[in-house]
Structure formats: structure tokens, C-alpha cells
Swiss-Prot record:
One of its GO terms (biological process) is proton motive force-driven ATP synthesis. The modification N-acetylserine is found at S2. Mitochondrial membrane ATP synthase (F(1)F(0) ATP synthase or Complex V) produces ATP from ADP in the presence of a proton gradient across the membrane which is generated by electron transport complexes of the respiratory chain. F-type ATPases consist of two structural domains, F(1) - containing the extramembraneous catalytic core, and F(0) - containing the membrane proton channel, linked together by a central stalk and a peripheral stalk. During catalysis, ATP synthesis in the catalytic domain of F(1) is coupled via a rotary mechanism of the central stalk subunits to proton translocation. It is a peripheral membrane protein. This is ATP synthase subunit d, mitochondrial. It is found in: Mitochondrion inner membrane. It comes from Kluyveromyces lactis (strain ATCC 8585 / CBS 2359 / DSM 70799 / NBRC 1267 / NRRL Y-1140 / WM37) (Yeast). Belongs to the ATPase d subunit family. Pfam families: Mt_ATP-synt_D.
Length: 174
């Protein structure tokens, strides 16, 4: 038995999926591949367990017409199995493998970028001062559109912030 067959027999598919944290389409494809592989192995073992020799002498003793048995034996001995060209299937598998590797590399890049962004955000959150300690100048420096919006509201004579009364209530005495 070759090393590849030995490794394939010992492969724990559930552990592979869980240890690589595969989800979605990749996990589904791997599971369906495992299912097809198991079915092919089962059929191979079933066919290998069947007897391959034919006892023609038994059929000659049972049947009256031995010519038929002779012809069948002649066909049986002259039969040569057809060799199948599997290069097309192998090229399809190689194409699938290369596509899977490309998808994995792309996913790895996306995950690495997302992790970098999340770490940066976490550092910003951890190093940020509490909101109640910020000054107006610091807010307008961080978000210049706030200053522009306030200036526009003052020009139009609006002194109320939309939604403020609904959220915090009206504190006017009148």
C-alpha cells in the first residue's frame, strides 16, 4: 500500500475541518468529497471481495449444449479490460485544487487585513479618553464635519439639534 493510500485511510476528516476552522462552501465541498471518497472505497472493496474466476467445467457438466460454454469461455479468455484515460479527471482535480488554493490565499489575505484593522481599532479604543473628558476642539479636529454642521445651523438660525428633545426631553420652563 502506498504512502498516500495509508495517509488517506488514517485521515480524520472531522478533525481536519474543525482544526482548520473551515466553514461555509469549503467545509461543504470537503464533506461532499469525503462522502464520494467513502462510497468509491466501499464499492472497490465490494468488487474486490467478489470471486473473479469462472468454473467452466461445472457449466459443461450441467448444460447439455457445451458449445455455448466453449464460446463463452473463449470470449472470457480473450477479453481485455478497456483502459480508461483519467488525465481529464486529473486535470479537473488539479484545476479544482489550484482554485481552492487561490481561494484560501485570498481568504487568508482578507482575514489578515481584518485582524490588522481590528487590532488597530482595539488599540484606539483602549487608548481613547472617556467621552466626557473630550473638548469641543478635539471633537472638531477628529470630525471636521461637526464644525461645518454647527456653522450651517447657526447661519440658518437653528439652535435646536434634531432629535435631541425626543431623546433627552425638553427642559424649558415655559
Amino acid at each position: 500500500m502506498s504512502l498516500a493510500k495509508s495517509a488517506a485511510n488514517k485521515l480524520d476528516w472531522a478533525k481536519v475541518i474543525s482544526s482548520l476552522k473551515l466553514t461555509g462552501k469549503t467545509a461543504t465541498q470537503l464533506s461532499s468529497f469525503k462522502k464520494r471518497n467513502d462510497e468509491a472505497r466501499r464499492q472497490l472493496l465490494e468488487l474486490q471481495s467478489q470471486p473473479t474466476s469462472v468454473d467452466f467445467s461445472h457449466y459443461r457438466s450441467v448444460l447439455k449444449n457445451t458449445e455455448v460454454v466453449d464460446k463463452i469461455e473463449q470470449f472470457y479468455k480473450s477479453y481485455k479490460p478497456v483502459s480508461v484515460d483519467v488525465s481529464k479527471q486529473l486535470s479537473t482535480i488539479e484545476a479544482f485544487e489550484s482554485q481552492a488554493i487561490e481561494n484560501a490565499a485570498e481568504t487568508e489575505k482578507l482575514v489578515a487585513q481584518e485582524l490588522k484593522d481590528l487590532k488597530e481599532t482595539l488599540n484606539n479604543i483602549e487608548s481613547a479618553r472617556p467621552f466626557d473628558q473630550l473638548t469641543v476642539d478635539e471633537l472638531t479636529k477628529a470630525r471636521p464635519e461637526i464644525d461645518a454642521k454647527v456653522e450651517e445651523m447657526v447661519k440658518k438660525g437653528r439652535w435646536d439639534v434634531p432629535g435631541y428633545k425626543e431623546k433627552f426631553g425638553d427642559l424649558t420652563i415655559m
